[in-house]
From Swiss-Prot:
Entry-linked CDD domains: Ribosomal_uL14
Protein task: Binds to 23S rRNA. Forms part of two intersubunit bridges in the 70S ribosome.
InterPro entries: Ribosomal_uL14, Ribosomal_uL14_bac-type, Ribosomal_uL14_CS, Ribosomal_uL14_sf
Coiled-coil regions listed in the entry: none
Protein name: Large ribosomal subunit protein uL14
Pfam families: Ribosomal_L14 (PF00238)
GO biological process, one term: translation
GO molecular function: large ribosomal subunit rRNA binding; structural constituent of ribosome
Subunit: Part of the 50S ribosomal subunit. Forms a cluster with proteins L3 and L19. In the 70S ribosome, L14 and L19 interact and together make contacts with the 16S rRNA in bridges B5 and B8.
Similarity section: Belongs to the universal ribosomal protein uL14 family.
Any GO CC annotation of this UniProt entry: cytosolic large ribosomal subunit
Length: 122
C-alpha cells in the first residue's frame, strides 16, 4: 500500500536509488497503490553520471510492497521492502536490468518487459 510521500527503493539500474511517491495515478481521489499500479515519483537519491538525476519527476510501476497482496486463490504475498521500476513516457523501463524478485501480478498488468528482465517472479 503506497500513498503520497511514501518512499520506495528503485529495483533497476537507471541510476536512482530512492524515490518518493508524489501522485497515485488512476482516479481523481485514489489514495493507495499496490503491486502493478503506476505512480508518479520524484527521485530523492541518485548515483552520479546516470540516466536520471535527483529531482526528476517520472512514472514508476510498483513491483514489491511490504503490505501483503491477496491473490485470487486466497494466498497472500508480501515482501521486505517497497520497490518500484522507473518508466519512460512510453511506459517502458528506463533501466536494462531488474534487481530482486517481482510479483506475478505484473504479468496480468502486461508489464512483460519487467517480468522477463526480473531474476525471479513470485
Amino acid at each position: 500500500m503506497i500513498q503520497v510521500e511514501s518512499t520506495l527503493q528503485v529495483a533497476d539500474n537507471s541510476g536512482a536509488k530512492k524515490v518518493a511517491c508524489i501522485k497515485v495515478l488512476g482516479g481523481s481521489h485514489r489514495r493507495y497503490a499496490t503491486v502493478g499500479d503506476i505512480i508518479m515519483v520524484s527521485v530523492k537519491e541518485a548515483m552520479p553520471h546516470c540516466k536520471v538525476k535527483k529531482g526528476d519527476v517520472m512514472q514508476a510501476v510498483i513491483v514489491r510492497t511490504a503490505k501483503e497482496v491477496r491473490r485470487a486463490d486466497g494466498s497472500y504475498i508480501k515482501f521486505d521492502s517497497n520497490a518500484a521500476v522507473l518508466l519512460n513516457k512510453q511506459g517502458e523501463p528506463v533501466g536494462t536490468r531488474i534487481f530482486g524478485p517481482v510479483a506475478r501480478e505484473l504479468r496480468a498488468r502486461n508489464f512483460m518487459k519487467i517480468v522477463s528482465l526480473a531474476p525471479e517472479v513470485l
